[in-house]
Regions:
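Accessory RNA-recognition modules of RNA-modification enzymes
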Residues: 1-174
């Protein structure tokens, strides 16, 4: 159930039924899980960037390991070899690359399950230096020329060097 956390007691509406599972829409959280936290990001409910921002750090790492184990199991591989998740102790500003999408005259993250870019804002996942890059490109995106931008990839290395790649799509109509 999207928006719920394991251990939540919820009221939900079933919206589809497949052979091996149901899909439901969250109506109300009646009792919160012990794993649930208040997301620090103001855009958490809008943005598809930080899907695990509403659970505590220990549980986040447990889910990540379970995801890998599940993928190994489905592929018929030995999942016993999957170790604990390697992670940074920092939950903020740890990303060294992001992809932003162009929509509505600016770059941003896609809203969850859509192709609509939402305000990049002050994303807590990436370094603060990325904000200046995104702000600059958004202010000058009309200067790119005759091709419409589609995506922007920002990456940095341990020395702090930043690489920006802007991908273009269709030709802008004249």
């Amino acid at each position: 159930i999207g928006g719920s956390v394991e251990g939540d007691l919820v009221k939900a509406e079933i919206i589809s039924h497949e052979k091996n599972y149901y899909t439901a829409k969250l109506i109300e959280i009646i009792e919160e899980s012990e794993y649930r936290i208040t997301p620090e990001c103001a855009n958490f409910s809008l943005c598809g960037g930080c899907t695990l921002g509403n659970i505590n750090f220990e549980y986040e790492n447990k889910i990540k390991k379970q995801t890998v184990v599940s993928a190994f199991r489905r592929a018929g591989l030995d999942y016993a070899i999957v170790g604990d998740t390697l992670h940074t102790d920092e939950r903020k500003h740890y990303r060294n690359n992001i992809t932003l999408h162009y929509n509505g005259g600016k770059f941003g993250y896609y809203a969850e399950k859509t192709n609509v870019a939402v305000d990049f804002g002050k994303c807590l996942l990436c370094p603060a230096s990325y904000y200046a890059v995104a702000d600059y490109v958004n202010a000058h995106v009309s200067d790119i020329g005759m091709f419409a931008p589609s995506d922007m990839h920002i990456r940095d290395n341990s020395a702090g060097d930043i690489t920006v790649s802007i991908y273009t799509g269709k030709k802008v109509p004249e």
